[in-house]
């Protein structure tokens, strides 16, 4: 949905050229195929208190390992770029940062990827993210 909105509404969040659209699609596909599922598994295991059991710790370790390959790719890109596409915040950053947020509770994973960690902090320091997060925290449990 986010890609559709960026594509139809335009603006700086969306692609400015066909090449940028291809890159947005590439990074979004990485987010939903290689990052989202293992990151959500880490979040869910931790949320259920599984990080305090050997089984849960094992599940977290397996899913962290699944994230290392896409994070290495992301780290390499972010070593030379401030953002994923066009050196500006786009829907690609939004999509991938949100999927990666699910794994932020892992105690050491992001420390292995300093450029990714810095990029994620930049994405989450945006006023729009801060407003969204405040609204989410204000929702009833």
Give the label of every model feature segment.
Residues 11, 76-88, 127-132:
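Surface-exposed helix-capping loop/turn segments at secondary-structure junctions
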Residues 1-68, 82:
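GST-like domain detector, emphasizing the conserved glutathione-binding G-site
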Residues 134-141:
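Terminal-tail/helix-coil boundary detector
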Residues 2, 6, 25-28, 71, ...:
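Non-transmembrane alpha-helical segments in soluble domains
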Residues 34, 38-43, 84-109, 117-123, ...:
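GST superfamily/GST-like fold recognition
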């Amino acid at each position: 949905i986010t890609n559709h909105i960026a594509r139809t509404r335009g603006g700086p969040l969306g692609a400015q050229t066909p090449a940028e659209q291809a890159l947005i699609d590439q990074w979004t596909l990485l987010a939903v195929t290689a990052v989202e599922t293992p990151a959500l598994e880490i979040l869910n295991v931790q949320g259920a208190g599984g990080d305090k059991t050997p089984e849960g710790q094992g599940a977290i370790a397996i899913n962290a390992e699944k994230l290392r390959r896409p994070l290495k790719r992301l780290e390499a890109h972010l070593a030379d770029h401030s953002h994923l596409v066009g050196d500006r915040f786009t829907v690609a950053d939004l999509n991938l940062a949100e999927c990666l947020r699910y794994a932020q509770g892992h105690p050491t994973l992001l420390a292995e990827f300093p450029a990714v960690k810095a990029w994620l902090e930049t994405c989450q320091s945006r006023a729009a993210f801060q407003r969204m997060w405040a609204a989410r925290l204000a929702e009833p449990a």
